[in-house]
Structure formats: structure tokens, C-alpha cells
Amino acid sequence: MTLEEFSAAEQKTERMDTVGDALEEVLSKARSQRTITVGVYEAAKLLNVDPDNVVLCLLAADEDDDRDVALQIHFTLIRAFCCENDINILRVSNPGRLAELLLLENDAGPAESGGAAQTPDLHCVLVTNPHSSQWKDPALSQLICFCRESRYMDQWVPVINLPER
């Protein structure tokens, strides 16, 4: 590996960390503003009803999920819909970290019916535009720019690794 190749690889790693941090910030803000939709079926319903307000689609799956044919079909349909409607898509390679971010302080106790709380489907997460104002968030702008640059390089669904904390 030459010095130039090493430098390019290091810059790419730093950029991915920066994009991962930006994604964490966007998810945190969207969660506090209640502009997140979680779940494959819930996402499909929202995309069908109001695709113009969706600014980001996250698809999260681990190696075990790669063998789930039904989930892969849903992912393919969601990706196609997002590409057709100019919705930015990211694939999250560590769904465990995504779950930590989205379920943090989220009714951590058991369900009120006395049974165990059912964990939500985090395979698909949509971030929508708040109706009160347009996002002027630099972290969201950075993610949108990253998605656009990835599309220019024919990488339609870039893979992001959320940094561990």
C-alpha cells in the first residue's frame, strides 16, 4: 500500500465516522421531535400516504437477516420506491447500535399488560420533515450531501457503520 492509498483509506474512514456521527445527531433530533417512523410495514404505509415529507430512509439488517427472504423483498421494494421518489437511503450495518439510539430511555419497563415488552421492528426507519419548519440542520445536510455524492459514484444505498459508544 502506497502512502497515497493509505491516506485515501484513512480519509474515507474519517468521513464514515463523521457521517455516522451526523446520523446519530439526526436520529436524536428526529426522535425528540417525534418525526421517526419505525418498522417495515409502518414505513411502507407512510411512504404510500406521504412520501414527500420523508427526508431519509434507513435500512438496517445484520448477517442473520440476509437469509430472511421476506425482509429482503421488502427492502428491495422500499429501495425502489425511495429511488423513484428521490428519498435518501442509507443502510446501517450495525442494527444493534441503531436499536440503542432509538430505544434509549424509550419505555424501558415491561408492558403495562403485565407481559414482556415487545421490541419494535427496527429494520426500516424513516425520518420525516417536521411540518412546523423546514430542516436547517447541518447534520441532515451532511447526510443528504453524502447520499448525493454516493449516488454520483453509482452507490445508490451507501452502507454506514454507526460508531460504538
Curated annotation (Swiss-Prot):
GO terms for biological process: cellular response to ionizing radiation; cellular response to mechanical stimulus; centrosome cycle; negative regulation of angiogenesis; negative regulation of blood vessel endothelial cell migration; negative regulation of peptidyl-serine phosphorylation of STAT protein; negative regulation of transcription by RNA polymerase II; positive regulation of apoptotic process. The keyword Coiled coil does not apply. It comes from Mus musculus (Mouse). Interacts with AURKA, GADD45GIP1 and PCNA. Interacts with MAPK14. Might affect PCNA interaction with some CDK (cell division protein kinase) complexes; stimulates DNA excision repair in vitro and inhibits entry of cells into S phase. In T-cells, functions as a regulator of p38 MAPKs by inhibiting p88 phosphorylation and activity. SUPFAM superfamilies: L30e-like. One of its GO terms (molecular function) is protein heterodimerization activity. It comes from the Eukaryota. Induction: By various types of DNA damage and growth arrest. InterPro entries: GADD45, Ribosomal_eL30-like_sf, Ribosomal_eL8/eL30/eS12/Gad45. Gene3D superfamilies: 3.30.1330.30. This is Growth arrest and DNA damage-inducible protein GADD45 alpha. Pfam families: Ribosomal_L7Ae (PF01248). Its main location: nucleus. Belongs to the GADD45 family. Keywords: Cell cycle, DNA damage, Growth arrest, Nucleus, Phosphoprotein. The lineage of its organism: Eukaryota, Metazoa, Chordata, Craniata, Vertebrata.
